[in-house]
């Protein structure tokens, strides 16, 4: 029986991932955790939740022992934009939290660890179009640096200790449920909210900025598909490229204008433009498709329909 701990279960991805995992493995078998951010009512009401700091090894170990955990999914991270404001915090949370996770999993002989990576691992020297699975990794942010180190650490634990460690390089993730927390691609979520609330949006990157993106249902699907894949089919482990769609801000705005004709957008690029410019336009995810059958379901138009519909429901209820 799987006993899964989701670290960072109050975050943008973790808050939705945990609910899907509970529907698959049973509410009591999927434990959520967070440091201080209050999780959603749905997370609290459907299963166990513990507050602790993953940087504190003893606290993480105690929760793993208490619930007899055999799989850890560590979603806790300081993201790219926030990490540039406080790089030492990003290093501490992202690296020490990961090391604690890997060491405890090794000591307790756990079944699996899943730790996501990011397109932030890419940087100058990476091909901008269809960034390959194997390519130059020279990130320009502390977040990206920790993710490169995390990929290498995960692969090291596979080779050195036989621990099953898996990871995938998330593109920008878009969702109408939990707001993102300080990433460079946050504009792709904020634009939908502002379109519904104010019919206008000021974007912090330029209109021709093009980045790989993914809708949350595909993000959850990719994570669980990789988690459930047969280990023997995996040639890669901690660093899978996963793609779904790629679009510029102008194309995103046009997609919204088709549905809200009065919507307008303006541009005031800030420090996040440099980060976005260091990332590729798209990724080559052939390895994920071959090794564990990755296949996304949503494109830009389908996502825009769903985002606007669900955010309008929130707005009409006075929730935003």
PLM regions: where:
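Glycine/proline-rich active-site loop of Rossmann-fold NAD(P)-dependent oxidoreductases
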Residues: 148, 161, 173-189, 216-217, ...
């Amino acid at each position: 029986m799987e006993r899964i701990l989701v670290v960072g279960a109050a975050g943008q991805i973790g808050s939705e991932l945990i609910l899907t995992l509970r529907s698959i493995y049973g509410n009591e078998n999927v434990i959520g955790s967070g440091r201080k951010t209050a999780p959603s009512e749905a997370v609290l009401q459907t299963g166990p939740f513990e507050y602790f700091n993953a940087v504190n090894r003893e606290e993480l170990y105690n929760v793993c022992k208490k619930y007899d955990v055999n799989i850890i999914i560590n979603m806790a991270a300081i993201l790219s934009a926030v990490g540039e404001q406080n790089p030492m915090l990003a290093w501490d949370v992202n690296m020490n939290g990961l090391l604690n996770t890997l060491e405890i999993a090794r000591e307790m002989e756990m079944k699996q660890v899943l730790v996501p990576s990011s397109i932030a691992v890419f940087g100058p020297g990476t091909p901008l179009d269809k960034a390959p699975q194997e390519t130059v990794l020279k990130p320009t942010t502390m977040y990206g640096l920790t993710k490169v180190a995390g990929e290498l650490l995960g692969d090291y634990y596979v080779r050195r200790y036989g621990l099953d460690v898996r990871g995938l390089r998330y593109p920008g993730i878009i969702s109408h449920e939990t707001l993102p927390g300080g990433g460079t691609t946050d504009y792709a979520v904020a634009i939908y909210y502002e379109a519904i609330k104010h019919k206008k949006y000021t974007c912090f990157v330029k209109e021709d900025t093009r980045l790989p993106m993914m809708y949350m249902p595909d993000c959850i699907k990719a994570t669980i598909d990789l988690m459930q894949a047969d280990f023997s089919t995996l040639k890669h482990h901690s660093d899978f490229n996963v793609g779904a769609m790629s679009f510029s801000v102008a194309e995103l705005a046009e997609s919204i204008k088709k549905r809200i004709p009065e919507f307008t957008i303006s541009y005031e690029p800030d420090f996040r433009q440099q980060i976005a410019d260091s990332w590729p336009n798209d990724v080559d995810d052939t390895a994920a498709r071959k090794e564990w059958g990755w296949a996304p379901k949503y494109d830009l138009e389908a996502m825009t329909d769903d985002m606007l519909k669900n955010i309008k429901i929130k707005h009409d209820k006075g929730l935003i």
